[in-house]
Amino acid sequence: MAAKKSSSPNRGFKVADQIQRDLTELIRDLKDPRIGMVTLQGVEVTPDYAHAKVFFSVLIGDGEASEEALNQAAGFLRNGLFKRLHIHTVPTLHFVYDRTTEKAADMNALIARAVASRSKDDDAA
């Protein structure tokens, strides 16, 4: 017997997008001073909706402290999602500090130094 296919193959992506939008609003209302200026980068939801990884970056503040504070507030945020989402299972939230922006800035700085060094070498020759 063939496995039953989901009636909406994009449902997981839609749920993840809705979770991201709702969490953005809920996090804005948190009063924890450890949470800096947080930007949610993306949400990955398991197929059974039991867990969701929430990737975020921090413009202002400490990323590790924000990660700890958000994971401590995960139950409160999940409860807020229960009130907003109309799905049977609201996933357990796991916040992950996304260092991609920092790494990109470091890479750009290295490239700029290499270009500056090369132009100095060309001028000297």
Curated annotation (Swiss-Prot):
GO molecular function, one term: ribosomal small subunit binding
GO biological process, one term: maturation of SSU-rRNA
Main localisation: cytoplasm
Cross-referenced InterPro entries: KH_dom-like_a/b, RbfA, RbfA_dom_sf
Family membership noted in the UniProt record: Belongs to the RbfA family.
Quaternary structure and partners: Monomer. Binds 30S ribosomal subunits, but not 50S ribosomal subunits or 70S ribosomes.
Protein name: Ribosome-binding factor A
